[in-house]
Amino acid sequence: MAQRVQEEDEQMMSTDDLIQAQIKLYHHCFAFIKSTALWAAIDLRIADVIHRNGGAATLSDLALNVGLHPTKLSHLRRLMRVLTVTGIFAVEDRNGEAMYTLTRVSRLLLNSDGEGTHALSQMARVLANPLAVISHFSIHEWFTTEKATTMTPFEVAHGCTRWEMIANDAKDGSVFNAGMVEDSRVAMDIILKESCGIFQGISSLIDVGGGHGAAAAAIATAFPNIKCTVLDLPHIVAEAPATHSNIQFIGGDLFKFIPAADVVLLKCLLHCWQDDDCVKILRLCKEAIPARDAGGKVIIIEVVVGIGSEEIVPKEMQLLFDVFMMYIDGIEREEYEWKKIFLEAGFSDYKITPVLGARSIIEVYP
């Protein structure tokens, strides 16, 4: 008995181990504060204030320009302390006063007066949206309750699908569509710089689920010879701006028909759907394109879990993104999972090019 007690004592954590475990646990619990602090920074347009102030601003400068209530100056300081320690902004001491400056991350939040050429503030709103966050608190019910298992966590939390919310709530729909435009512009800017060869030699392309046509506009500008078409739901394409003369918008249902083109582009679309639906979409894509030797292919821009940067942040982001997508019963796939649906849809080969950090370009051939 004494020996067993001694062995159990030896297995107990040391004081330092206990403290470190507690810190790590609490750090996880407080992770949502990073998102809410970022959300506040976007609402207050702190990045724009710093930019307009010559690239550096004191706390008083920020307070004067964000409409801060006089009683909240110390609270703003505390918010900025979190935003600097997490790398959104930088801070330096200048003559005893904190001076806040932009980082590479906060430059992505610039969106005023055309300064934010790589603006992602609306996309950040999409990803950190309280509607999505609240949905994740329904995952336990979604996992364990018979009725809930036939719904998405978003439906469990809000009583409608994510897509119904976007269609019926003008403000939410506007933010979502603006976020998709921002993400497409940044992604296409990188792709056209690093992998523009994927569009060489083609004469027509259809962007399925292409929203307001940001990706198609980038391609049409870089390759004026490519006739671009955007297919999306009628109410989405009806609101699309006339961004380029060489783009045609078609309202339709991607599960019923995809117009013919040399190449079908699917950007961040298939991760919204389970395998059976992906196979249906891809089979229609295969019907829409010519044979491989005639230039036919499908270009997919998605996460391939486990492929890409070896740095911890992109690898962790892939897994976080995967669980995030659960809120609409979506999924981020590993290579073997992609291969399975490609083969089931009747494709013969594919090529993965990881040029987007956590995301990759997948070229799929008939």
Curated annotation (Swiss-Prot):
Indicate where this protein is primarily found. Answer: cytoplasm
Can you tell me which residues form the catalytic site? H271 (proton acceptor), E302, E332
Which tissues is this protein detected in according to the database? Expressed in roots, leaves, stems and flowers.
Keywords, in A-Z order: Cytoplasm, Melatonin biosynthesis, Methyltransferase, S-adenosyl-L-methionine, Transferase
Q: Where in the cell is it found?
A: Cytoplasm
Broad EC category: transferase
InterPro entries membership: COMT-like (IPR016461), O_MeTrfase_dom (IPR001077), Plant_O-MeTrfase_dimerisation (IPR012967), SAM-dependent_MTases_sf (IPR029063), WH-like_DNA-bd_sf (IPR036388), WH_DNA-bd_sf (IPR036390)
Keyword tRNA processing among UniProt keywords = no
Pathway listed for it is: Aromatic compound metabolism; melatonin biosynthesis; melatonin from serotonin: step 1/2
The chemistry this enzyme catalyses reads: N-acetylserotonin + S-adenosyl-L-methionine = melatonin + S-adenosyl-L-homocysteine + H(+)
Q: Which residues cross the membrane?
A: none
GO MF annotation: an example: protein dimerization activity
Q: Which Pfam families match?
A: Dimerisation (PF08100), Methyltransf_2 (PF00891)
Q: What is its EC number?
A: 2.1.1.4
Q: Which GO terms describe its cellular component?
A: cytoplasm
Listed binding positions for S-adenosyl-L-homocysteine are G209, D232, D253, K267
Q: What Gene Ontology terms for biological process does this UniProt record contain?
A: biosynthetic process; melatonin biosynthetic process; methylation
Q: What does this protein do?
A: Methyltransferase which catalyzes the transfer of a methyl group onto N-acetylserotonin, producing melatonin (N-acetyl-5-methoxytryptamine).
Which family does the record claim for this protein? Belongs to the class I-like SAM-binding methyltransferase superfamily. Cation-independent O-methyltransferase family.
Subunit info here reads:
Homodimer.
Protein name, entry field: Acetylserotonin O-methyltransferase 2
Specify the taxonomic lineage.
Eukaryota, Viridiplantae, Streptophyta, Embryophyta, Tracheophyta
Gene that codes for this? Answer: ASMT2
